[in-house]
Amino acid sequence: MQRRHILHTAAALALIAMGQPVLAQNTFPNKPIKLVIAFPAGGPTDITMRSLADNAGKILGQPVIVENKPGAGGTLPAQQLQSAQADGYTVAQIPLGVFRIGYTTKINWDPVKDISYVINVTGYAFGIVVPADGPLKTWADFVAYAKANPGKLTYGSTGTLTSPHLTTELVAQKAGIQLQHVPYKGSADLMLAVVSGQLMAAADSTGFAPQVEAGKLRVLNTWGEKRLDKFPNAPTLKELGYDIVQNSPFGIGAPKGTPPDVVRRLHDAFKKAMEEPSYVASLARYDMLPNYLSSADYTKFAQDTVGREKVLIDKLGLAKPN
């Protein structure tokens, strides 16, 4: 009788233990979620992602707390996922730089296989700006100065190997000019540098909009398929003769092995958060638009993008030595 009681008790405990992951998933989340983003506070990424996080927190019933982790070309949040618990309580912004890091830096994780892709949310509107009172009034002026002064035209971006950096270098290669790149950690510091004259130009997302609207900066070009509504006089790269469109889509990832039910819960909450007018309005401030991809489509995007980024890295001669 005692032996039967022990067996029944052991079986019951085993069933309880087996049920714990399911219970955890069904009650997710029961504490705050951390969203790590790749750029500093006060810039367009920070402002728009905080709006998204605020909306998602209300939907999930738990706060989504933003943590800024700038540097390393926007790849630090993805690296943080490699040591985070796969429970959905740490998620991260995945900028395009994540898909090129393996070609330029020795890493011990795979950008496709070692991240659970939750949802793509938006992309950037980029351009090149110069001081409004400076000598460079048009893109033709920019190219002419750079050709006459090889390596002396300074421009900044939000970091080495970011999309603004690499796209500008690709344009420079096509234009036959040599520029001097100065990396910054975020848009706020970058804009201060170009407005104050420390730099001759900046390649950035439209975090430059307030400075342009204040008459301090001039937009020489933008990088979308069509001209931006805020800056209709600025030509696209395609109009200037470069077959380049860059909007650098980004979304949210979780650690590898995050339970599918948790990924689905996060996806559904962030998708609803994307549809809130407050988030759409925060994007519009920077000429950005919602750009939804489901978890499956975002995973496929990651796989395809890793291949495309290799072509760009090779073209610019930036691949790490074997």
Language-model segments: which ranges?
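An extracytoplasmic/periplasmic, membrane-proximal ligand-sensing/linker region
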Residues: 30-32, 173-174, 260-322
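Beta->alpha turn/N-cap motifs
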Residues: 92-98, 157, 187, 203-209, ...
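N-terminal (or domain-start) structured segment
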Residues: 24-114, 152, 176-203, 211, ...
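C-terminal lobe and pocket-closing loops
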Residues: 123, 208-275, 304-307, 321
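N-terminal export leaders
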Residues: 3-8
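Hinge/capping helix and adjacent helix->loop/strand transition within the periplasmic-binding protein
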Residues: 80-89, 102-189, 237, 247-282
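A ligand-binding cleft/hinge motif common to bilobed small-molecule-binding domains
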Residues: 97-106, 170-174, 201-232, 310
